[in-house]
Amino acid sequence: MPVVFNDIMVTYVEHLKNILNHILDSYQILNEIEDKPGDLSKIEKEMLKINGFIRVVSNKIDTDKIPTSDFQTLKIKFSRYLENYSFEKEIKTMASLYSDDVSRVKNMRLKILEALKNKHMMDDARELTVNL
C-alpha cells in the first residue's frame, strides 16, 4: 500500500527503509562526535531523533506489510530499547552541570551507543535496509 508524503508516493517498504536510514544516519553522527565542550547538545539532538524514529517503527509500522521476517525481530528489539533505556533525564541534568566536562560528555555518548548496539540492534537495522 503506498503512502503519500509531500505529494510523493512511496511504498510502505520504502517508507520503513527511509526511517531506518534516518536512524542509522543519526547513529553514525553519534559515533563521529569528537567529545568537545558543547557537544552534549549534539548528542541529545541525535539521541532524540533516534528515539523518535524508533518509536515510529515500534508503534506505527505494521509487521504484516513488511515482507521480511527480520523486521519482526528488529521491531521487538526497538520496543525493548524504548522500554529499557532513557537518557533524557541524565542529559538534562548534565547539561546544566557538566556540559563542558569532556569526559562526562564522552561517557554519556558511549553509554547511548552501547545501548543502541545492544543485541546487535544497529547491525540488524543496517542489514534490514540492505535486504528490503
Predicted features along the sequence, with ranges:
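Long, low-complexity or tandemly repetitive, helically biased scaffold regions used
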Residues: 2-132
